[in-house]
């Protein structure tokens, strides 16, 4: 093992980025799945580095986000156009969520500048695949899909202006009522289908998916579970069930050779069942679902957890601590990338690395690379 680590554990410089030798084996991978700890400063330079490398060296053009499709439309609009008003709106919608960090602003401004230098067929597109966390972001995102604004009824515009004032941290009966009426009047199926096809034009199918997402998020079983996340695994399980269906939907619409990068909370990314130390339950994670049965991406998923160390403290990555061992000790003082899935890897052999209680198989059943990120701090909230 020591010989392997000396060969494949590589210090990384965020400015210089990754190279093929450092990243290592990438054969047959189409879905690169990084696992972060939310609100940490070091996840942002890591995300830039990973995205740029995967775009330039592995042909990844799609950034999948741990956000709703509506919120994703706002970000994608910004990174294609540089519309600062939309970026500010999107950031305001992130407040109170797992993406509430001022470093989000720098990330998306960097990606806009990077994207503006790419030819049209090589530009990166951002797509939200999670549930619709923020109603306001969803509504605003839908307006970006409208191709024929002259078809929008005045009554809808009035309801929209009321509904867009909904707050996450307070209840406004009039705003909620306006939202319900608006969705009822514009739901793009049944008797409304013809009209809404005229409104959304070529974007109709995307609009239908977002409306369906809103229905999913409002279902009582799911809606109530989000208030009991310490004891009820339903919230996480349903979110990942939803995400896998969105990915399936994308695979049916994007080019057959499309490749993806996603940076999610680490809990979602592992490819094999494992216990969780924070709420001590198991569930069918997104990383596991991607490799299930006949799913089109089975065997093509590369999970890359970030082992994050705060200044002066031990790792905050609760789940990665299930795997953390003395063999990493020599590599925690600087950002380090380790490819675990090379041909001669001891991490793919049983009995070489002892897994913690509740884990079975070998380390590369769970993930294939790791990125060690020392000297992290809690990121300031969005201003």
Where are these regions (language model features)?
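Compositional signal for N-terminal targeting/processing segments
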Residues: 1-383
């Amino acid at each position: 093992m020591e010989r392997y680590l000396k060969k494949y554990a590589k210090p990384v410089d965020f400015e210089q980025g990754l190279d093929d030798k450092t990243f290592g084996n990438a054969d047959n991978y189409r879905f690169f799945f990084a696992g972060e700890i939310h609100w940490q400063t070091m996840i942002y330079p890591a995300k830039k580095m990973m995205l740029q490398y995967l775009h330039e060296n592995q042909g990844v053009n799609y950034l999948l986000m741990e956000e709703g499709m509506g919120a994703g439309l706002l970000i994608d609009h910004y990174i294609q156009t540089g519309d600062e008003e939309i970026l500010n709106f999107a950031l305001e919608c992130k407040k109170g969520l797992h993406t509430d960090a001022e470093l989000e602003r720098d990330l998306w401004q960097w990606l806009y500048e990077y994207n503006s230098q790419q030819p049209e067929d090589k530009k990166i597109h951002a797509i939200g695949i999670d549930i619709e966390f923020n109603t306001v972001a969803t509504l605003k995102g839908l307006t970006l899909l409208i191709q024929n604004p002259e078809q929008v009824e005045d009554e809808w515009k009035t309801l929209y202006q009321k509904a867009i004032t909904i707050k996450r941290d307070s209840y406004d009966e009039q705003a909620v009522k306006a939202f319900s009426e608006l969705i009822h009047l514009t739901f793009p199926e049944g008797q409304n289908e013809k009209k809404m096809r005229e409104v959304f034009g070529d974007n109709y199918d995307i609009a239908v998916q977002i409306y369906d997402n809103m229905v999913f998020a409002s279902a009582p079983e799911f809606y109530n579970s989000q208030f009991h996340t310490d004891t009820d695994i339903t919230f996480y399980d349903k979110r990942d069930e939803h995400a896998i269906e969105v990915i399936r939907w994308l695979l049916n619409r994007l080019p057959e050779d499309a490749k993806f990068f996603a940076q999610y909370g680490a809990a979602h990314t592992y490819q094999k069942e494992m216990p969780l130390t924070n709420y001590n339950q198991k569930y069918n994670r997104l990383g596991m679902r991607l490799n299930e049965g006949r799913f089109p991406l089975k065997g093509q998923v590369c999970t890359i957890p970030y082992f994050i160390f705060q200044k002066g403290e031990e790792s905050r990555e609760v789940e990665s601590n299930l795997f953390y061992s003395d063999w990493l000790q020599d590599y925690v003082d600087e950002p380090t990338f380790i490819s675990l899935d090379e041909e001669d890897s001891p991490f793919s052999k049983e009995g070489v690395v002892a897994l913690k209680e509740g884990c079975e198989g070998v380390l590369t059943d769970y993930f294939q690379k790791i990125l060690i990120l020392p000297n992290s701090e809690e990121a300031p909230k969005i201003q």
